[in-house]
């Protein structure tokens, strides 16, 4: 059994006649309160947790991205020779981070058919507001500069590819 001791100086209500309605004598005679409760141990059995040395640590694979500059987002959409899949994300969004390797796979699989662009909604709130981005991640597929499909939430690579192909009526 474990116990916790609280002195009357730790718990202000034990010193205060107004808060407890206890007389001054009773309040002075209460010097400590003990709470007892069972403490359970967590058994790990034969589980072993190896320590990681600097040689065994995993480092994330670097993905090369083409950083392009355009006068405006609309220029990018209108001047693209392929449909553009725009991923609206935020760095603090867990599902958005989950989608990073999936988008890389989709981009590689459909590289001849679409261009993938990521827009950080924290850095570009005007673009997010224009397209009424209220959930993250949100994907909008643009064809000829106009939105042709929109979907929200995390998807598998297979689901995302199928959705894009259905929207564009293209097959790999």
Curated annotation (Swiss-Prot):
Gene Ontology BP annotations: positive regulation of catalytic activity
Positions bearing the site annotation: Deprotonates C-terminal active site Cys: 87
Pfam families documented for this protein: Thioredoxin (PF00085)
Active site (UniProt): 93 (nucleophile), 96 (nucleophile)
Transmembrane segments: none
Keywords carried by this UniProt record: Chloroplast, Disulfide bond, Electron transport, Plastid, Redox-active center, Transit peptide, Transport
Cystine residue pairs: 93-96
MF (Gene Ontology): enzyme activator activity; protein-disulfide reductase activity
Tissue note: Expressed in roots and seeds.
Residue ranges occupied by any Thioredoxin domain in the UniProt entry: 63-169
Residues under site feature: Contributes to redox potential value: 94-95
GO cellular component term, pick one: chloroplast stroma
Residue span of the annotated presequence: 1-62
Localisation: Plastid, Chloroplast stroma
Record keyword Disulfide bond present: yes
Main location: plastid
Family: Belongs to the thioredoxin family. Plant Y-type subfamily.
Task performed by this protein: Thiol-disulfide oxidoreductase that poorly activates chloroplastic malate dehydrogenase (NADP-MDH) and fructose-1,6-bisphosphatase. Provides reducing equivalents for peroxiredoxin Q.
Protein name (database record): Thioredoxin Y1, chloroplastic
Organism phylogeny: Eukaryota, Viridiplantae, Streptophyta, Embryophyta, Tracheophyta
């Amino acid at each position: 059994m474990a116990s916790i001791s609280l002195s009357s100086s730790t718990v202000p209500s034990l010193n205060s006649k107004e808060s407890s309605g206890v007389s001054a004598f009773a309040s002075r005679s209460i010097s400590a309160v003990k709470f007892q409760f069972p403490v359970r141990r967590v058994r790990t059995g034969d589980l072993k947790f190896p320590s990681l040395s600097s040689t065994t640590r995993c480092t994330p694979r670097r993905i090369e991205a083409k950083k392009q500059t355009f006068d405006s987002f609309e220029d990018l959409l209108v001047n693209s020779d392929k449909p553009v899949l725009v991923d609206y994300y935020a760095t603090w969004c867990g599902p958005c981070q989950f989608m990073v390797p999936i988008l890389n796979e989709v981009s590689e699989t459909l590289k001849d058919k679409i261009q993938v662009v990521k827009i950080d909604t924290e850095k570009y709130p005007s673009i997010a507001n224009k397209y009424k981005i209220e959930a993250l991640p949100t994907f909008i597929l643009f064809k000829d500069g106009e939105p042709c499909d929109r979907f929200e939430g995390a998807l598998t690579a297979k689901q995302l590819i199928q959705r894009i192909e259905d929207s564009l009526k293209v097959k790999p």
